[in-house]
Every structure is written in structure tokens, then in C-alpha cells.
Amino acid sequence: MARDADTLFRLTAGLIEDHLPGQSPWTTTEAIGANGFGADPLFEALIAERDGQPIGFVSFFRGYAGWRGKAMGIVHALYVLPEERRSGAARALMAGVARIAREREWIRIELFVEEGRPAISFYDRIGMRDLNHRHMRLEGEALERLALDSPGIV
């Protein structure tokens, strides 16, 4: 567990560096360990290795497709070391999530990807469809303000 949490931390740092050069990770090895390997895990992860060395990971969790009334998988992050890209590692990681989805009878896998990212063509190649949805986020002060807004009906 501790080794996997450390591996996921290092790979997450690489993912952050790809997206926001110079930015330090906002998480810690301890947080990854507690959130992924504790009594009530918030996510699962698969780690790809070559010759015993980690080269990438995918993290995912179970979600709910309300319109269909069934469970689904949500990929939170997919990352492969730059020198290992186009090696089949990303496809193997996503295939692993697909096998888990099939075993657990999840009806689909979803993920969010930033516009213009090179990964979009990879997702197209493995059969994912672009839904053209917006990804919205509420956090920080906006979350706090909304939480305090109570019309008294909930």
C-alpha cells in the first residue's frame, strides 16, 4: 500500500508537471494512501510497469448514471511517462478499467479531458465519444457561499 501510494504520488506529480509546469502537487503520499487504500477508498488505481518500474497509472471511481439507474466508471486521471507514450501503456490501463467495468456491470466509462489535449485522439481511437459537455466546478469561496445559502426547502 505505502509503495503504491508513493508511486501514485510520483506519477501524479508528473501529470501535474505536464499540465502546469512548475506547479507542485496539491496532494501528499499520505493523502493518496488514506484516500485510495483506507477502509472506505475514494478511488482505485491501476499502475502500468515495464521491467518492474512504474510507467503510468489510471485512477478511477464508481459513479451513478441516474437516467439509466446503473453504476458507471469515471476515470479521474490517466498518465504515462513521456518516454513511454505510444508504447501501448495507456491502452492497457484503459483496457484494465474496461475489464473492471464489465466485471462489475458498469454500463459505461466516462472521463473529462481538457480541450486541445493530445490525449483526445487516443480516446477517439479506443472508441470513446466526445459528448461536447461542459465540465463545471464549484470550490473554495464559491462553494462556501452556496453552502450558506439556505432557502429552507432542503
Segments (PLM) and residue ranges:
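Conserved beta-strand-loop-alpha-helix junction that forms the acyl-donor binding cleft
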Residues: R85, I109-I120, R137-A142
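Conserved acetyl-CoA-binding loop-helix of GNAT-fold acetyltransferases
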Residues: V80, R86-R99, R125
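Conserved GNAT acetyl-CoA-binding A-motif
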Residues: M94, A101-E114
